[in-house]
Amino acid sequence: MKGETMKITLIGCGAIGKLWLSSLTLQGHETQGWLRVAQSDLFVDVNDPSGRTFRELIPCNNINHLQTSELVIVCLKAWQVSDALLPLLGNIPENTPILLLHNGMGTIEELAPIRHPILAGVTTHAAWQKNNQVFHVAHGITHIGAINSQAQAYYPIADILHEALPDVAWHNHIQTTCWRKLIANCVINPLTVEYDCKNGLLIDYPKQISQIIDEICAVMEAEGLHTDKSELTEYIYSIIYNTSANYSSMLQDVRNNRRTEIDYITGFLIKQARAHGLSTPENDRLYHLVKNREQQYDDFRSNLHRSW
């Protein structure tokens, strides 16, 4: 499949979604976006770290394009995925792979049972959006892999995506990679909300970080996953140092009165812990702290009825 062009639909056109749309379009793929409020096209304006710009009108919400798509990529918040995807499944060919790119875990369970090949992915690319302009501020790695047996034959997609937006790596055990990203999210996201700080200032709270990691390691071991606390701690601190000047996505959501992904990050961890009879007191406390912040938003409850 390397060098092959594909017909692709990308559901969710935020900063990361537009980054993928621009990269795949430049590579010659036949792309379209898919928006909650349907429109025929979308102006995509992406600026990369080298100063290059992409400015094109990309078609959107064409049902015929969706029905003949060879790949569907979902770049939404975790809590938006099932609302967005489930109504569309009947228009996506059953042999078309669907790649989920989002923070957190638990969306797969909401989509079950599903016949389509499902791929999960996590990315370390950093991008933000202001006034509909996307700024790709840091290159990263996107890790993808099969979630169900139907998706195992689709490993060549990693090469196609790598050509568009490197680096992309295929993993035979993507769940381990997803758990690794979950650990970072469980530490960095809620703690930055609690202390209203940039990521780098979390080095002042080593005891809390250690307790969170201890609780997560216990859950991972109960799930049958290998853990090494010292290695995971080093991994977490490397992220804190490398993103020291950044505000976490969860803190940005709270500051902008938006719903967070806490239910699919710390909430998912707590749910798995309960299934194994484990307690997670520090993660419980942080979960309720973020949920209480959400409930303070004037418009939060009115937004709950909205689909993605």
Say what each PLM segment does.
Residues 2-57:
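NAD(P)+-binding Rossmann beta1-loop-alpha1 motif at the extreme N-terminus of oxidoreductases
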Residues 101-177:
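Rossmann-fold dinucleotide-binding core
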